[in-house]
A protein has these predicted regions:
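C-terminal alpha-helical cap/extension of soluble enzyme domains
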Residues: 235-274
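Glycine-rich beta-to-alpha transition loops that act as phosphate-gripper elements at the mouths
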Residues: 47, 104-110, 226-237
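Alpha/beta enzyme core
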Residues: 28-32, 50-74, 84-99, 109-223, ...
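Ser/Thr/Pro/Gly-rich low-complexity, intrinsically disordered segments
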Residues: 2-6
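Active-site proximal loops enriched in glycine and acidic residues that flank catalytic Cys/His/Asp
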Residues: 196, 231-233, 255
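N-terminal amphipathic alpha-helix/helix-capping segment at the start of soluble metabolic enzymes
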Residues: 21-43, 90
Length: 274
């Protein structure tokens, strides 16, 4: 944007150029609603350091794809705090000239962690109240709906514990109660994570697969609410496609990135490139 400024009494015209901020975080709400309507899913990839963040942003820009950068509370602590993460990501968006939509999202947040991320400048948060009785999950989620709306952020909530381990929290991979999903969805959240037999980490050989019966029942009761599939690593492609057909608009991936990073690092060192 350009504007003319007049130097008082001299008759000289000074042209001032103001650079508008072109590279900035957005909420996940709009990108997931577009994904829902377009019958595709947006990838959520957890970041644990600068290298992961750079690789994910580069790939998203090359593919012209929106992306959600997920941060667990453990990763946030490792990177010295959520404000450090926000500063790093905002700086990289600008320096790398990232033009695709990018959301910075707290993954499996506690109530206290959600408040810290709101204060730090995240554009989206997930409150994981799945380990609480449904009444307490509802109460805390309701409070966060109000706060996130005031700050123009998007909010994900969870019903039914996702299996495996996430930041030291172990879930058994239960299937959520569709009626409880509706209770949480009706509070005004933007997207919903529900346990449908999915787990974090590697899937065991005896894994029974996703419960599409549960997913279909949840979708029927929550309407056009974008749904989230956690534990995306290792789920067969045909199951992924069917989940998207039934309303999944966001798929979380972390384990696959960890395995790839570890393998590449090990290979680099073994080849003596250090």
């Amino acid at each position: 944007m350009e504007t003319d400024g007049r130097s008082g009494g001299t008759g000289c015209s000074v042209k001032i150029t103001i650079q508008m901020e072109a590279y900035m975080l957005v909420t996940a709400k709009e990108m997931l609603e577009k994904a829902r309507d377009g019958k595709y899913a947006v990838g959520h990839f957890n970041i644990n350091n600068l290298e992961w963040t750079k690789a994910i942003l580069q790939t998203a820009e090359e593919l012209r794809s929106p992306v959600i950068l997920g941060v667990s509370e453990g990763a946030g602590k490792y990177m010295t705090g959520f404000k450090t993460v926000v500063g790093m990501v905002n700086g990289m968006l600008e320096e790398m000239k990232i033009t695709v939509p990018v959301a910075l999202h707290l993954d499996h947040g506690t109530y206290e962690g959600c408040l810290k991320c709101i204060d730090a400048g995240f554009s989206s948060i997930m409150f994981d109240g799945s380990h609480y009785p449904i009444e307490e999950n509802v109460a805390k989620t309701k409070e966060l709906v109000k706060i996130t709306r005031e700050h123009g952020m998007s909010l994900e909530a969870e019903v039914g514990s996702i299996g495996g381990e996430e930041d030291g929290v172990i879930g058994m991979g239960e299937c959520a109660d569709p009626k409880e999903c509706k209770m949480i969805a009706d509070l005004g959240i933007d997207f919903l994570a529900a346990g449908i037999g999915n787990i974090h980490g590697k899937y065991p050989a005896n894994w029974k697969g996703l419960s599409f019966e549960t997913l279909d029942a949840i979708q029927q009761l929550t309407g056009d609410m974008p749904l989230v599939l956690h534990g995306g690593t290792g789920i067969p492609t045909d199951m992924i496609k069917k989940a998207i057909d039934l309303g999944v608009s966001k798929i979380n991936v972390n384990t696959e990135c960890q395995l790839s990073f570890a393998e590449a690092t090990r290979k680099y060192i073994e080849e003596g490139k250090d």
